[in-house]
Structure formats: C-alpha cells, structure tokens
Amino acid sequence: MSNTITPTVFYRTLNVEGLEIFYREAGPRDAPTVLLLHGFPSSSHMFRNLIPMLADKYHVVAPDFPGYGESSAPSVNDFDYSYERLAIVTEKFTEKLNISSYAMYLSDIGASIGFRLAVMHPERVTALIVQNGEAHFEAFDKEFSKGLFDYWEDRSEKNAQVLLDWLLTIEGTKWHYLHGVRDPSRISPDNWVIDQANQDRPGNKDIQLSILYNAKRNLDAYADWQEYFRKQQPPMLITWGKNDGIFTVEGAELYKRELPNAELYLLDTGHFALEEEVDRIGSLMHEFLDRTINKN
C-alpha cells in the first residue's frame, strides 16, 4: 500500500475586471508555476487528472475562460469574445495572482490565447507544452473544418445553423472526446455531459459561435506567433494525439520549423489526449519541466 499523499486541489474564484474567473490551483506557491489553458468545448475540468500529477513540484493553476465552465459568461452584447480580449483577461488573471512567470500547457483555443499571451509578455514564459493546438494553417483537418471555414467566409444564419446542428450538440461534443481513441470505454461520459450542460445554458451557444467566428483572426496572428518562436526559442514539448480529427499531425510537426529543438511525441489517441494518455503526458512534462525550468 502506497504512502504517497495526493496533493490537494483547491477550487477558487477571482474577480478580474468585473468577471468571476473560476480556477483550480494546487502545489506550493513558491514553486515554478505551470498555467494550464483549456480547449473547446471544455474547461479546467480537462486537467482534473493532470493537476495532482504536477503539483508535487509545481504551482499549478488552471482557469476557466469567460464563457466556459464555472467562470462568468456575459452575453455577446456585454463582452467581446475575441481571442485578444480573452488573452487580456488571462493576463490580468495571472497578474492578480502575482504570477510573474509561468510555463504554459496549451490545447485547442488555449493555444490561441496562450500564444497571444506569449507575444505580449515573452519574458514571462519559461516553457511551452503544446497538445493539439495550432499555430499554422496546415494544422486544420480540412474535412472537419469545412463548416467552420464556410462560417468564416460568410457569417450567415445558414452557416451558423450548420455548426449549431452538429458541432454544438451533444453528438458533436461527444465526438470531440471519442474520435481517435483506442478504447472508448476508458473515456468518462462526464466529459461531454458537463461540457454540453455548459453549452446549453441560455445564451452560451451565441458565445460559442462568437468564439468560433473570431478564430478566423488567428490566421493573421500566426505570423506573429511564428516570429516569437524563431526569436525567443522557448523550450517546447509537443504531446499530440495523432488521431485527432480536428488538428493534423502536420500541425504538430510544423512547430519544429521555427523551433528545431522542440520535443515531439505523437500519441495513439485523439483530440483530448489527456483522457487516455495522462500518465504518459504527466511523465513527459515532469521530465521536461525538471530539465528546463526547475533545475535546482
């Protein structure tokens, strides 16, 4: 019988510019910080199993973005759901917690927010862990993305309805978790039930449509992110679910174009790689972070 004590995870809320930002926190506050930024359509819930694995050595913080999880979700008329604005809220969140430097785990929309944060404050970023989050257009699976690209081209009710009829339904949310996994019986239904319950709140589908549409602006931001990679050469660990139906393996490999020393691991799983590969990813992160930001 193991005597290992599992680190305690705290569930807190912080007021940031009038928004109640929910976050999970664990580990010693005087240790190096690891900031976990979640993807669509999830929340910090996606990190529930990873946080205790890192909190023995690291100060781990995982916020819910506005519009997700337990954080405030003001209407699209009352809040700008652009990635630029979400990055600023995340910036203010870290500053209010007096976090002056951090490694970032970036997945899906978390990458779009985190890379903006890195460009804003390169001096604060100690390392990057990228898991199925894109910084190159080639990363998009063209079949999956057709409806999204059509919406970017023409923000019509017809094109919005295509997204509403599948991507933002329980079937679409469930697909995010099950597509490409080795063993669906290992994936808890809690994932898509919780995510869909959040999306089904009044006004939240409008929020998601706004965030999906505003992802179009990432195309113009890629050059800035790639220049940041080339100039700053941040340590990067890439742990990528190679069976993802949203972002391709090419999207993972392209990071090495700007960051030849990036460490790439292709894992036999889908978009939410932590669901099947949390032990592997946690182990890789520990080894990587111990070597790059916690050398003492």
Language-model features and meaning:
Residues 39, 248, 276-277:
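Active-site helix-initiating loop/hinge in glycosyltransferases
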Residues 2-21, 26-33, 61, 68-105, ...:
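Flexible "cap/lid" subdomain of the alpha/beta-hydrolase fold that forms the substrate-access gate
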Residues 270-282:
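Catalytic histidine-centered segment of alpha/beta-hydrolase-like enzymes
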Residues 36-39, 62:
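Structural cue for short, hydrophobic secondary-structure segments
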